[in-house]
Amino acid sequence: MITGASSGFGAACAEKFASHGYDVIITARREDRLTKLKKSLESKYGIKVLSLCFDVQQMDAVNKAIGSIPDAWKKISVLVNNAGLALGRDSFDKASMQDWETMLNTNVHGLLYVSKAVLPLLMAQKKGHIINMGSVAGKEVYEKGNVYCASKFAVDALSKAMRIDLLPHHIKVTSINPGAAETEFSLVRFKGSEDQAAAAYDGYTPLTAEDIANTVYYCASLPEHVCINDLTITCLEQAGTYYFNKE
């Protein structure tokens, strides 16, 4: 099951798992994109896709969608908590409170709502794997990152807490922390400004959505007794959040 599957990391993860024969549950807010992805994956790989359209920010909608999953789909082996976003790149004093609320509601509350709703299915199986999409911004704060960084620090802490608390239930928890990756992320962050979004990747080759999907699949495909707890991945020309070797 993959949240935020309508684009970027989520769509690439759905493609990766489907290419290895997994049936996949894809979720997002944009139903048209989910429908298109479902048709593509089923046609290309001959697998089954269950599409659930909901906003992870809405707890009732999350619970209703997860509660509607047919019995045949309830044996979820991997949950990829991918839904997330950044909005704006402003200093603390100038940033939008509405942007802050949307980031916290999506990146933190959304992860909690989905995890809490899916967890009983994993516990009933006494196995499963929760993969949370963190960020290098959850490891090191950067200028004008403020609440986005805080939301990803929360993902980092929650991943560690979940790993400990779910240990008796044989459930793996992994936090994957990407650096700069060229998806719709910057376009969303800069609210549709293509120039600003493109400038974020000037002078170096960033990660791709496929790079992250490969990493997610690698973590999920290890032997049952192996769990990668925390993995940070950047492109060659990035170290941490600040340091880039740009041409």
Region spans (language model):
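The beta1-alpha1 cofactor-binding region of Rossmann-like NAD(H)/NADP(H)-dependent oxidoreductases
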Residues: E31-D32, C53-A65, M97
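Residue(s) in the substrate-gating loop at a strand-loop-helix junction
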Residues: S135
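Active-site helix of classical SDR
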Residues: S115, S151
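Conserved glycine-rich cofactor-binding loop
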Residues: S6-S7
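Conserved glycine-rich Rossmann-like NAD(P)H-binding loop of the short-chain dehydrogenase/reductase
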Residues: Y22-K36
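C-terminal helical subdomain
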Residues: S175-I176, T183, D195-T241
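Substrate-binding pocket helix/loop in short-chain dehydrogenase/reductase
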Residues: D90-F92, S96-E101
